[in-house]
From Swiss-Prot:
Its main location: membrane. It holds the Pfam family BORCS8. Belongs to the BORCS8 family. The keyword Membrane applies. This is BLOC-1-related complex subunit 8. As part of the BLOC-one-related complex (BORC), it plays a role in the movement and localization of lysosomes at the cell periphery. Associated with the cytosolic face of lysosomes, BORC recruits ARL8B to the lysosomal membrane and couples lysosomes to microtubule plus-end-directed kinesin motors, driving lysosome movement toward the cell periphery. Component of the BLOC-one-related complex (BORC) which is composed of BLOC1S1, BLOC1S2, BORCS5, BORCS6, BORCS7, BORCS8, KXD1 and SNAPIN. It comes from Mus musculus (Mouse).
Length: 120
């Protein structure tokens, strides 16, 4: 009577052992299959996100370059205000000289047009 009971226990142990070996042998392949499925599903979306991010980065770099260029231009204008003031002063001086020359020319033309004082 003990022998059939021992055989039953031995069979249970070997069945459990065989099942464990089978699960361990197949588990990595199932995990790799699931991983492969996940990658196949996710990869196109990730590739699209990557392309979008690269496009946004290029647009951002262009905008940053434009802003930096504009800031540089404004700074150059601010720095050149000294030259603008100098040009303004020279223009005022030129206008003053022109007005003085016009006044002098009008005075000479009036002398020519007016009759000489009579010698009486």
């Amino acid at each position: 009577m003990e022998e059939p009971e021992m055989q039953l226990k031995g069979k249970k142990v070997t069945d459990k052992f065989t099942e464990s070996v089978y699960v361990l042998a197949n588990e990595p392949s199932v995990a790799l299959y699931r991983l492969q499925e996940h990658v196949r599903r996710s990869l196109p979306e990730l590739a699209q996100h990557k392309a979008d991010m690269q496009r946004w980065e290029e647009q951002s770099q262009g905008a940053i370059y434009t802003v930096e260029y504009a800031c540089s231009a404004v700074k150059s204008l601010v720095d050149s205000s000294v030259y603008f003031r100098s040009v303004e002063g020279l223009l005022k001086q030129a206008i003053s000289i022109r007005d003085h020359m016009n006044t002098s020319a009008q005075g000479h033309s009036q002398e020519k047009l007016s009759p000489p004082p009579s010698l009486a």
